[in-house]
Amino acid sequence: GFGSLFKFLGKKLAKTVAKQAAKKQME
C-alpha cells in the first residue's frame, strides 16, 4: 500500500543522507 511505499522511500532517503553526512565529515 501507500504506507509501505512511504517507508521504503524513507529508508532510501535516510541512507542517502547518512552517506552525504559521512562524506562531509571526511572532508
From Swiss-Prot:
Keywords: Secreted, Toxin. The keyword Secreted applies. One of its GO terms (biological process) is defense response to bacterium. GO terms for molecular function: toxin activity. GO terms for cellular component: extracellular region. Expressed by the venom gland. Disulfide bonds: none annotated. Its main location: secreted. It comes from the Eukaryota. It is found in: Secreted. Belongs to the cationic peptide 04 (cupiennin) family. 03 subfamily. This is Cupiennin-3c. It comes from Cupiennius salei.
